């Protein structure tokens, strides 16, 4: 078991993810009610960028942070972040679903975030997004053997098992490592790939910018996160669900929608 206190002696294993659970599932374990929300889709897209299945072209120098409300400046920044779908080789069903969702939203393999954001104000696009999002979540659950209440030997009837509590503690220690300057300097990532992987896991806990601040910005993924790309994806996808014209009732679906942000302009 990994503890995290001043008396504990650490070795380089502290920098390794404690299990092979996927990023969306790790995020779900730390979320309220263990839900898979829109951030699961955003995390899947980050992973596809990291795997070079989605190319990322950013025409912007320096770091960028989105404020509490989207401004015209934010929209212009989004215009300078272009994604291009370049999927090659075998993909998981959920990865294919995520890519198809992006294609359907944008009617193209290449698009910038501003254009995608404005599309989500169109109710027909939003309705299609909801269906595609449901397909993505369904595929993700199937791949991970998760039915919303039970997951491996970690969750039973929506409650952490003894093993689950142990795993969660280990992930908490890894989370603490990701944002610890002292531990990161002592046990730094040894490659570009490991550096990106650690920052990707940081996104699972919403500390991706903290993790990046003490690591290198040396890949397409880290540059995307440096421009607040993860947060922007969540805002865009939340906006799509807010603009669904026919709200369903009684199906128990929870999206984790945050309505603080609105996308200016029509579809």
Predicted features by range, described:
Residues 1-267:
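Acidic, Ser/Thr/Pro-rich intrinsically disordered cytosolic tails and loops
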């Amino acid at each position: 078991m990994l503890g995290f206190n001043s008396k504990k002696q650490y070795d380089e294993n502290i920098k390794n993810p404690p299990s092979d659970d996927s990023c969306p599932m790790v995020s779900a374990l730390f979320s309220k009610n263990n839900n898979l929300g829109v951030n699961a889709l955003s995390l899947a897209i980050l992973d596809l960028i990291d795997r070079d299945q989605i190319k990322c072209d950013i025409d912007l120098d320096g770091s960028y942070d989105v404020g509490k409300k989207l401004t015209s400046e934010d929209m212009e920044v989004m215009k300078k972040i272009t994604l291009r779908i370049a999927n090659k080789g075998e993909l998981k069903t959920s990865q294919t679903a995520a890519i198809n969702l992006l294609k359907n939203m944008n009617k193209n393999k290449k698009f910038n975030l501003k254009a995608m954001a404005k599309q989500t104000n169109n109710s027909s696009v939003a309705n299609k997004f909801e269906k595609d999002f449901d397909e993505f979540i369904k595929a993700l659950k199937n791949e991970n053997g998760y039915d919303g209440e039970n997951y491996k030997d970690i969750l039973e009837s929506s409650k952490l098992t003894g093993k689950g509590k142990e795993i969660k503690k280990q992930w908490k220690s890894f989370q603490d490592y990701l944002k610890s300057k002292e531990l990161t300097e002592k046990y730094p990532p040894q490659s570009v790939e490991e550096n990106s992987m650690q920052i990707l896991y940081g996104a699972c806990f919403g500390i991706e910018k903290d993790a990046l601040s003490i690591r290198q910005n040396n890949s397409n993924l880290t540059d995307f996160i440096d421009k607040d790309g993860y947060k922007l994806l969540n805002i865009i996808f939340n906006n799509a669900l807010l603009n669904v014209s026919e709200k369903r009732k009684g199906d128990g679906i929870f999206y984790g929608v945050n309505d603080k942000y609105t996308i200016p302009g029509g579809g």
